[in-house]
Regions:
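Substrate-binding clefts and catalytic carboxylate motifs of secreted carbohydrate-active enzymes
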Residues: 32, 65-68, 80, 90, ...
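Short, electropositive alpha-helical surface patch
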Residues: 51-54, 87-102
């Protein structure tokens, strides 16, 4: 959430204007989006309408007014996820972020219960490649329960999630090399399962994976590690 005083709105307006003029001619640009998950998190945590959210006018009035004047060609979406329902992450309209799977400890096979119209964010964690880890991780730390190894997963209970979902589908190996391979394989199975389900579900018009890459050697949602492997 952000303030809506005159000075801050003026600063936002200038920043939006400069960046729209800078980026609007890129051929890969499909849509402008006001924010990431602000309305959704407000609705979840405050149990009230996102229209009461501090900063609401920035996304629903200020930014669209600027775009109308300098780039009316590209569509604008106030937030992601967002739709016409009270719940910004509803299956009934707009787009969704599917984080019941993984973040809320739900197995990826439960994707069959997802009725999204368009999934603009979903993902599943796996470790970086063995060669990438070996560049920074001494032999003494190459253990799945080692604190240095676990430090390179920044989600709360991220390593525990990897183990839980791995145990549901593949053998649990305590040997470090085998663990890396099987955890990567399970990440691939998870993404494949979700993508194939949404491709065959006529209600779902598309899905976007979070995320393509990462900036350091880590276990994360990335499918390409920091060494581009």
């Amino acid at each position: 959430s952000y303030p809506e005083n005159d000075d801050f709105i003026a600063n936002v307006s200038e920043e939006v204007t400069q960046n729209v003029l800078r980026l609007q001619h890129h051929v890969c640009l499909a849509i402008w989006c006001g924010n990431n998950e602000n309305e959704w998190i407000w609705h979840q945590e405050q149990k009230s309408s996102y229209k009461k959210m501090p900063g609401y006018n920035i996304y629903h009035k200020v930014i669209p007014a600027i775009l109308k004047n300098i780039d009316a060609m590209h569509p604008y979406w106030q937030s992601t996820p967002f739709g016409n329902d009270e719940d910004p992450n509803s299956f009934e309209s707009g787009n969704t972020h599917q984080w019941n799977i993984w973040s809320r400890w739900i197995d990826y096979t439960e994707v069959v219960n997802d009725k999204s119209l368009f999934v603009t964010e979903f993902g599943f964690q796996g470790p970086a490649n063995k060669d990438t880890f070996e560049k920074y991780l001494p032999i003494k730390n190459r253990n799945i329960s080692d604190q240095v190894f676990e430090h390179h997963n920044k989600q709360v209970e991220g390593p525990e999630r990897i183990i839980k979902f791995l145990s549901a589908h593949l053998p649990i190996k305590t040997e470090w090399n085998e663990y890396l391979y099987l955890a990567q394989l399970n990440q691939a199975f998870a993404l494949k399962t979700c993508l194939e389900y949404w491709r065959t579900n006529k209600k779902t018009n598309g899905s976007i994976i979070w995320q393509i890459n990462d900036c350091w050697p880590v276990s994360s949602w990335a499918i390409v590690d920091s060494d581009t492997k």
